[in-house]
Amino acid sequence: MPNSLAAVPSMRFPFLSLSLAVSIALAGCSNESTPPAASTAAPATTAKAPVKADARNHDESSYAQPQLVVIKDLALDLKLDFDAKQIGGTATYTLEWKDKAAKQLVLDTRELSIAQVQADDGKGTLAPLQFALAPADKTFGSKLTIEAPNQPAKVVITYHTAPTASGLQWLEPSMTEGKQLPFMFSQSQAIHARSWVPLQDTPSVRFTYSAHVTSRPDVMVLMSADNDPKAARDGDYSFKMPEPIPSYLLAIAAGDVVFKPISARSGVWAEPAMADKAAKEFEDTEKMIGAAEKLYGPYRWGRYDMLVLPPSFPFGGMENPRLTFATPTVIVGDKSLVSLVAHELAHSWSGNLVTNASWKDIWLNEGFTTYVQARITEALYGVEMAEMEREIDQGDLLAEVKDMAPADQALALPPLAERDPDEALSQVAYVKGAWFLQFLEQRFGREVFDPFLRGWFDDHAFQSATTDQFVDYLNKNLLDKHPNTVSAAEVDAWLKQPGIPAFAAKARSRSFSIVDTARIAWSGSGTLPSKQVTGEWGTQEWVHFLSGMGATLKPEQLKQLDETYHFTGTPNGEIAMRWYPLAIRSGYTDARPAAGEFIERVGRRKLVLPIYAELLKTPDGIAFAEQAFEKAKPSYHPITTASVAEMIAKAKAAPPAQPQPQPQP
């Protein structure tokens, strides 16, 4: 929802914590433009203003009305047009009408051009239906209202996307690893699926789907479905997803990719130059699947494959079922960042199998997944490894909540009325959610808690759930059966109160005490820890070493670190995102050119936004950031582009910041 230390000694552990390797925190992205009114085969009225959130009573982020009618199956027949940067074709919906009085089908769209809407009687006869496409809301897109007085069992929509669709990125060959063929991919979470398919774009609705996709014959097309590793690259592809999924898990990609098997049910797709390296990096995937199955039951999605995308992918990973999307920034040669796989794999139970019913309950996806990820880590790599990850995560969370509104610090968020769900997501959902489950585990013991959690997954498989439903399940299946172990007030403190409860046990890593001692010794004497000490450090220890530095250091101190560990120019994004901001704040100018090259080359939001944020605090930094952004923009994903553009605009509009105090020699 997605980097080792290139110049630092080899890693002792191949996992990295969520806050380091699996930041799939969603980017706030909305398209300001309003698409032209679509032509109508059967004219209908057009709304005169965007429909506001108070008209959406089930999910504040969707116009859909699933209490009246739901999509049960989606059949796509699409053509990919790389020249026009568009997807076009038809979407056929099999519907279940829940209300006999319902006369309309309402769908979510964003920047879609709707050519026609038809009712399908199932016998080959299509009849036009009236529809109205409302003007666009900048966050939620356009409400598509289809008049369906006879409640047809199937509806067919002919449409095409805009080149600026927020959920799609089209890359020129020069932006790929191979430099020969174009590449495209989707990112549907949280509410971007509506930019490439008209849908009930809410996680409360699940549907099966099939797809027929045509493209130029020299690219391979893949979807979050049953991709055939032996499929011919011929420009004509068919897919089927037999398990019901929510709209945000609908995914497509096309490019010059080849397949490398890892196990009988798992493998990796990547550009040819990256394929062998990716397969080697992810070779422990089958062990991870086995560890998760032992804890939480069988993997229910058939295959678990991964697709390594170009560097412009804005996240670390995306848990698209049967085809996890992954950033290439985790392919570093030492397996130090493959916790991304553990996190996205964990979503196969928490998120994909049991899904938050709306984005205000996203902790049910991300908190559970972070907890499951930690259990996989512990099963494969030991208790101390998991404890280090928890301590890093918890420290990052405690720092983040200091600047958050109290309501945003609760796990059960208030309704997201008129609020982009991307912007509402924070480490609270991930880390506080996992911390709550760890608290329950500690109180009840694993012999009780593990069967409870597996029961939650089994009893709600292929369903969406709310926080209230989880609390009911918790009461009936855990608290009531084991009275006087956890109180309702304690549960309330986790779910509805800001901050972390005072009774929460914090993670404590023994390994980090050695790192702290080494850092303190260097700060006092100027003597860096010996290779005998650092040779035993893994990625977590190095990140902890850098994260514990003060806000600024003397330039000569940074130079000493740089000459010893070669942080400047590292391809390790996790180090880069910590090193470059520290260098910029401290006036260590030797690092600035490499910082610029890094943000021009990498489009992953987690890695580049902290560097932009630090640059934008000074006038010369703003100028430098603008120059780098102009070079990077052609290869950035629309989500990253929107985030950086907003940051720059705010920085230029703000009064000049006071200069950072520099350490005195």
Features from the language model and the residues they span:
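Hydrophobic alpha-helical and helix-loop surface patches within well-folded domains
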Residues: 33-42, 51, 114, 239, ...
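Mature, folded catalytic cores of secreted/periplasmic enzymes
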Residues: 62-70, 75-79, 83-86, 92-94, ...
